[in-house]
């Protein structure tokens, strides 16, 4: 062998520094490593010297001679000098029909005590959204069995919607109604940043314990920021697997706000400058990367997505709420004041909108919905006059008509948590209100 060919072979061999490194510094939220030359987004495995703890982490920052890793778990138990290796499987998770009926964490490790999950297919957690020119037109209704939504804020198959509400207004109950009443053959639920006790409560109370067609991905509030962040992306990857099989998928995530808070923790720890309400720029850049992955793709299935947004102090100008509204195809606002009148779910139809509705409903449905909203708005505008008895019947024919329909409209807006209606039933009820 010539000297030149030997040199060429040696250059082509991976350098030792590319294979493993060591932990050189540990902080409360990240681990500094040296001797490894990773790229941002690489997954590494940290092998503890004391053999009590091994863990995975993601490379979030790279400098000339060192890199910084955010662990999927917590840093306790790791020591300076622990070995660090690049994880060969990268950011891939197992996916398959075996996930149906299971509750898993963001790394697809079972949390339900039902044993190991044996999937043969793998999918990347991070993936580009559907190409704009490959998106299918949204021209089919997507029923969720809720009168207010299907009748007045009709969704389309492949649409992305937000559910905006303050704490304790009924987001979880509404989520459960949507999952339970939806006709979608596959349902993927992401519970991100939830309290631990809320997970079994959601499954038993809102889903009735029936998970046959459902996959639940859980990252509770006590999980690391990286687990909470990637829990959302893992759930979307699972939904994409079923979409790629030609299936229509319901994706529902609670909540975008806690997902954003997880990225805020990561970003601030890396030295990003805080902007509005302490959120670094990476948070606002991350939202479309997640939300735009939902939709309808030509030649494949669809992902119809509902993202809940926790609005602090019912402030709809919150930066996460603002950014989410700009990305999504519609928004459903829950109003705390409506609960005082016994209206559940407390959907504020004046401040809610579905941008797809006109493309998926027929002319009669559209006209009946417009009449309903017009009557509702008139009653709200004249609420004070009506309450103090200052309005004289006959002064305004349109308002008189609205007053005559108030009881029927209130009944339409109310729905029990365990009730569900078909599209045909809802369209009939809406038509009857305008023609009674």
Give the predicted meaning of each segment.
Residues 82-84, 91, 98, 111-159, ...:
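P-loop NTPase nucleotide-binding/switch module
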Residues 19, 27, 40, 99, ...:
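A generic structural signal for well-ordered coil/turn residues at beta-strand boundaries
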Residues 53, 91-95, 109-116, 133-136, ...:
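Active-site phosphate-binding and catalytic loops of NTP-dependent enzymes
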Residues 25, 35, 48, 61, ...:
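Flexible glycine-/small-residue-rich
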Residues 151-152, 158-436:
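P-loop NTPase catalytic core
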Residues 34-35, 93-97, 115-116, 165, ...:
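Ordered, soluble secondary-structure elements with a strong preference for glycine-centered loop motifs
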């Amino acid at each position: 062998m010539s000297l030149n060919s030997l040199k060429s072979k040696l250059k082509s061999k991976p350098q030792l520094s590319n294979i493993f490194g060591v932990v050189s510094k540990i902080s409360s939220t990240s681990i500094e490593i040296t001797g490894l030359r990773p790229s941002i987004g690489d997954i590494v495995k940290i092998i503890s010297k004391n053999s009590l703890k091994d863990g995975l982490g993601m490379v979030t920052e790279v400098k000339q001679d060192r890199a910084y890793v955010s662990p999927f778990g917590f840093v306790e138990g790791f020591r300076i000098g622990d070995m660090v290796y690049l994880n060969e499987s990268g950011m891939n998770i197992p996916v398959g029909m075996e996930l149906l009926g299971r509750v898993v964490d963001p790394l697809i490790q079972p949390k339900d005590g039902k044993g190991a999950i044996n999937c043969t297919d793998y999918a990347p957690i991070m993936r580009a959204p559907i190409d704009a020119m490959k998106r299918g037109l949204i021209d089919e209704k997507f029923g969720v069995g809720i009168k207010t939504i299907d009748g007045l804020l009709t969704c389309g198959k492949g649409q992305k919607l937000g559910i905006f509400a303050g704490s304790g207004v009924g987001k979880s109950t509404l989520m459960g109604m949507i999952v339970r009443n939806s006709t979608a053959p596959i349902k993927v639920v992401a519970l991100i940043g939830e309290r631990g006790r809320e997970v079994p409560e959601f499954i038993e109370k809102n889903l009735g314990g029936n998970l046959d067609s459902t996959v639940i991905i859980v990252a509770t509030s006590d999980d690391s920021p990286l687990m909470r962040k990637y829990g959302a992306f893992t759930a979307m990857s699972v939904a994409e697997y079923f979409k790629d099989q030609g299936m229509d998928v319901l994706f529902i995530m609670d909540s975008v706000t806690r997902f954003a808070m997880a990225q805020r923790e990561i970003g601030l720890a890396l030295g990003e400058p805080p902007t509005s309400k302490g959120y670094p720029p990476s948070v606002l850049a991350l939202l479309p990367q997640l939300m735009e992955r939902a939709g309808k793709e030509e030649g494949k299935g669809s992902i119809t997505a509902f993202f809940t947004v926790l609005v602090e102090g019912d402030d709809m100008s919150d930066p996460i709420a603002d950014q989410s509204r700009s990305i999504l195809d519609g928004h459903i606002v829950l109003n705390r004041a409506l609960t005082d009148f016994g209206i559940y779910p407390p959907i504020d139809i004046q401040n809610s909108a579905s941008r797809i509705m006109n493309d998926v409903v027929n002319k009669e449905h559209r006209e009946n919905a417009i009449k309903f909203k017009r009557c509702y708005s008139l009653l709200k505008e004249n609420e004070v006059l009506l309450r103090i008895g200052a309005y004289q019947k006959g002064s305004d024919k349109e308002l008189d008509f609205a007053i005559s329909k108030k009881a029927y409209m209130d009944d339409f807006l109310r729905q029990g948590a365990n009730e569900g209606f078909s599209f045909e039933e809802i369209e009939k009820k809406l038509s009857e209100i305008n023609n009674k």
